[in-house]
């Protein structure tokens, strides 16, 4: 009886030690993320307080700065102006609700107070945004994000915006046409790298919807190609999120309106992002 009891205890201790080792190993793999800062840029799928971005930040105990705005798209409009309001002024249409303005808001947080952000000097400003555009980071600021994740593209597809030619990815970012998807991605990734070179930039593709779209997969492929050419991790949420057109067309299981994720859908997205970040930072060890 004593031998059996000894075996049970020993087996239990082995199990406990194994679990502890696995837990410590998992934490070690991503120790460079824990307690750090993460920035989310995107549209209405990312903007909610309990979105995949919040779920991801909570998992790693990271501080989240969410700059996403409902309705945003990658590509500029013909009349887009520099507009750093948290909710860009629409002037009747969504001309300023674009990723470039979210990136400018990010740059203001990372650039020292009073320093001019020269790229904006070439552009027109909305009357509500003072020119020149300058940094807002004070000497006491601790803002120093480890990761910026940009999740966008579904509104570009719905609005019929041009993907453009892949050659836009090879241009100096100042010459990239932000009215095309490729040009907008090149500009955003490149300018963030210029001002925050130690920050990892991750791209997310759109997820599937309940309604069929022939164009959306083309935008997904373009974002993946952009990630590859710009040496920027890109996560294929369209294929990996577990949210599918086939299921959502019959029942709103993960998308409450056929487009926007409910709590379960956001959880699925968060889990995919977490997995990829673990893989990304494990490979860096």
Residue spans of the language-model regions?
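Catalytic His-Asp segment of secreted/periplasmic serine-dependent ester chemistry enzymes
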Residues: 82-84, 206-285
């Amino acid at each position: 009886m004593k031998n059996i009891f000894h075996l049970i205890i020993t087996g239990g201790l082995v199990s406990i030690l194994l679990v502890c080792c696995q837990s410590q190993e998992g934490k070690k793999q991503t120790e460079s993320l824990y307690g750090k800062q993460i920035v989310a840029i995107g549209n209405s799928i990312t903007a909610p307080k309990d979105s995949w971005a919040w779920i991801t930040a909570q998992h790693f105990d990271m501080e989240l700065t969410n700059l996403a705005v409902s309705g945003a798209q990658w590509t500029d409009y013909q009349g887009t102006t520099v507009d750093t309001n948290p909710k860009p002024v629409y002037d009747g249409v969504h001309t300023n609700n674009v990723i470039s303005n979210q990136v400018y808001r990010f740059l203001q947080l990372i650039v020292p107070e009073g320093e001019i952000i020269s790229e904006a000097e070439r552009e027109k400003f909305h009357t509500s945004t003072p020119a020149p555009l300058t940094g807002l980071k004070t000497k006491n600021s601790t803002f120093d994000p480890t990761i910026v994740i940009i999740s966008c593209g579904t509104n570009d597809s719905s609005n019929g915006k041009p993907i453009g030619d892949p050659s836009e990815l090879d241009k100096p970012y100042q010459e990239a046409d932000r009215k095309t998807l490729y040009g907008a991605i090149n500009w955003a990734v490149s300018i963030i790298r210029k001002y925050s070179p130690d920050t990892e930039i991750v791209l997310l593709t759109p997820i599937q919807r309940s309604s069929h779209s022939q164009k959306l997969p083309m935008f997904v492929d373009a974002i993946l190609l952009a990630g590859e050419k710009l040496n920027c991790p890109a996560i294929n949420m369209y294929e990996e999120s577990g949210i599918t057109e086939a299921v959502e067309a019959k029942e709103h299981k993960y998308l409450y309106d056929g487009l926007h994720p409910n709590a379960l859908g956001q959880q699925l997205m968060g889990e995919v992002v977490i997995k990829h970040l673990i893989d990304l930072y494990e490979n860096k060890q």
